């Protein structure tokens, strides 16, 4: 019976930790969503200001004004898309729900630890305790209708690969590092792509303005 409770304790530990990981991942996703909204909002305003201040440079470069306008429109579309994605996925509220559920599971894990330490004989009463603990575990786990992803669970296992409970999996260090890298990027990779595309799209505008400005300022120009 003690072995059974130890196994249940491992399951609770694994579930609660995976849900902590899921909560952290969703919070990071929400943060990058907010940063992206701010970034693209600033870009839209900056392009409008640049087009106004450097009107002469824009007029001197064919198609540059239309290109900058297209970038402003694209940034506006991304703002709408990210806002809708954030509203639909409810990352913040889901993260809070997962975190609270993980806290409940942690409390149950401590109770299981206490019962393991109290067990001295294999008796009917002991098995009744185990059944009650299992029922409580199932109840708490089902109380949260948002589940963690398999990647959150895998990240937990690889992070504790040297623990006796998971040593049999023989997970190598490079595998753990790769899972950690993938887990970190899993919730933000598309935001990073948006940032890179946005920054790359601004290069022609800034380069053209700089080139025309230097040409205009060159002695003898015109």
Model-derived regions, located:
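Alpha-helical transmembrane segments and their immediate juxtamembrane boundary regions
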Residues: 27-93, 176-221
């Amino acid at each position: 019976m003690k072995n059974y409770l130890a196994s249940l304790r491992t399951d609770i530990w694994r579930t609660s930790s995976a849900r902590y990981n899921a909560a952290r991942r969703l919070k990071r996703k929400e943060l990058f969503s907010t940063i992206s909204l701010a970034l693209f909002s600033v870009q839209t305003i900056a392009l409008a200001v640049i087009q106004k201040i450097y009107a002469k440079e824009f007029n001197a470069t064919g198609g540059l004004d239309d290109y900058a306008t297209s970038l402003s429109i694209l940034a506006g579309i991304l703002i709408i898309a990210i806002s809708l994605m954030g509203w639909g996925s409810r990352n913040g509220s889901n993260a809070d729900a997962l975190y609270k559920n993980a806290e409940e599971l942690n409390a149950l894990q401590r109770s299981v630890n206490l019962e393991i330490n109290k067990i001295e004989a294999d008796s009917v009463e002991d098995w009744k305790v185990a059944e009650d603990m299992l029922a409580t575990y199932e109840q708490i786990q089902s109380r949260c209708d948002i589940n963690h992803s398999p990647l959150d669970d895998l990240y937990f296992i690889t992070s504790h690969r040297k623990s006796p409970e998971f040593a049999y999996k023989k997970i190598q260090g490079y595998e753990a590092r790769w899972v950690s890298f993938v887990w970190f990027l899993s919730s933000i990779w598309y935001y990073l792509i948006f940032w890179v595309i946005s920054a790359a799209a601004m290069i022609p505008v800034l380069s053209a303005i700089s080139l025309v400005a230097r040409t205009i300022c060159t002695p003898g120009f015109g």
